[in-house]
Amino acid sequence: MALNSGSPPAIGPYYENHGYQPENPYPAQPTVVPTVYEVHPAQYYPSPVPQYAPRVLTQASNPVVCTQPKSPSGTVCTSKTKKALCITLTLGTFLVGAALAAGLLWKFMGSKCSNSGIECDSSGTCINPSNWCDGVSHCPGGEDENRCVRLYGPNFILQVYSSQRKSWHPVCQDDWNENYGRAACRDMGYKNNFYSSQGIVDDSGSTSFMKLNTSAGNVDIYKKLYHSDACSSKAVVSLRCIACGVNLNSSRQSRIVGGESALPGAWPWQVSLHVQNVHVCGGSIITPEWIVTAAHCVEKPLNNPWHWTAFAGILRQSFMFYGAGYQVEKVISHPNYDSKTKNNDIALMKLQKPLTFNDLVKPVCLPNPGMMLQPEQLCWISGWGATEEKGKTSEVLNAAKVLLIETQRCNSRYVYDNLITPAMICAGFLQGNVDSCQGDSGGPLVTSKNNIWWLIGDTSWGSGCAKAYRPGVYGNVMVFTDWIYRQMRADG
């Protein structure tokens, strides 16, 4: 976690670290012909450094001045022939630009379906919304029948999709009990032993509900529900599928400013991910079994789970040599991750043995649909990354306060010049001074809402550390929650 831009070291290689990877802890290797970003691992051992291409800004940061001379009349095209040619060229340029924009939009948004269709992830087939959650599988992978339940907003309102209305509706409290709550959480991908509690939220303003049919028999929870315009209790169900987003010392968080050492229990979801006893990346606990990290951390050869050990609840790296780590059983990288652009930079790790939760080890909440992020929203980053550019991994866990930066501003030519996709979030300060850095990759970007901490980003990339107009870039977890739940369901 960098407090400011460090100076280049007096000796050794100096290079722009665009992915926040840690320094290579292995001894120097025989001299080879260098390439700018290539990492040469020690013989017989996998490199603990995530290997990937750096982000390169495509334009200079200074404005480009057009020096084309104009005619005395103030226009370039004077004759009829020239005017016709200019119009043709202008129209052609516009059409080409529109086609490129459409192609980029399709690429980054990742769906080929129109507004009237929903895409099957397994095949790319477009399904009519009326066929989604109708009790019949239309997608080859069956995802149209297992993505019918969700939690909405910061109050965890339980919603179920209605194929009749082609929209999501809250579940009426009438006849509801804990058993149904556990079943709904299980449908999302949580295990029964994760279940926390259910609540009731006054939602008398709603005019459309999903109500329980108690005589429906032993079927999936969404098949027990039917659409109704009335709810006798005038209350809807709120579910906590796991006790998440709670930390210690919440009243003392203002003391952790600008990258200071973290307090015990302040960031209990933070894990240190090691390869061969060396910290490589960070991660965030979302259940006793699942860790969220960055896809660039687990590029080959580090996609093999046996390389990885996770440490939770320990603030100092030196103490991890004496503590028991948790071996990783499975590594799942997002299938659409692009190692060049860092688009869809998210991955999951499943642990061989579940974590035991306590005051120092707790999960962070995944964001729910309906949660809106605001420009300059207060967030926090944490990790064992370097405290200055080109520095070494920190001994202690650090945390720092950052602000969200709106995508339009972050995509300006003076910042990242259209490198930011909908699957990314910018956070930090345009003046620099506070940022993620080498070794922070995969770690959390969190924000507090309703006294609950939410994971809204995973540390992805940047241009150097804490440089002006080069804020940190994070994977947009709000885009990936459906994918995360799908992996949890498939492995449940």
Swiss-Prot record:
Site positions for Cleavage: 255-256
- Please state what class of enzyme this protein is: hydrolase
Q: List the disulfide bonds.
A: 113-126, 120-139, 133-148, 172-231, 185-241, 244-365, 281-297, 410-426, 437-465
Q: Where in the cell is it found?
A: Cell membrane
Record-level GO BP terms: entry receptor-mediated virion attachment to host cell; positive regulation of viral entry into host cell; protein autoprocessing; proteolysis; viral translation
Q: In which tissues is it expressed?
A: Expressed in several tissues that comprise large populations of epithelial cells with the highest level of transcripts measured in the prostate gland. Expressed in type II pneumocytes in the lung (at protein level). Expressed strongly in small intestine. Also expressed in colon, stomach and salivary gland. Coexpressed with ACE2 within lung type II pneumocytes, ileal absorptive enterocytes, intestinal epithelial cells, cornea, gallbladder and nasal goblet secretory cells.
Give the recorded effect for residue 316 to A. Answer: No effect on catalytic activity or HKU1-CoV viral entry
Which residues are annotated as active site?
296 (charge relay system), 345 (charge relay system), 441 (charge relay system)
Question: Altering residue 412 to A/N: what's the impact?
Answer: No effect on catalytic activity. Reduces HKU1-CoV viral entry
Region HKU1-CoV S protein-binding: start and end of each range? 340-470
Detail which positions bind Ca(2+).
Answer: 131, 134, 136, 144-145
Q: What is this protein called?
A: Transmembrane protease serine 2
Organism the protein comes from: Homo sapiens (Human)
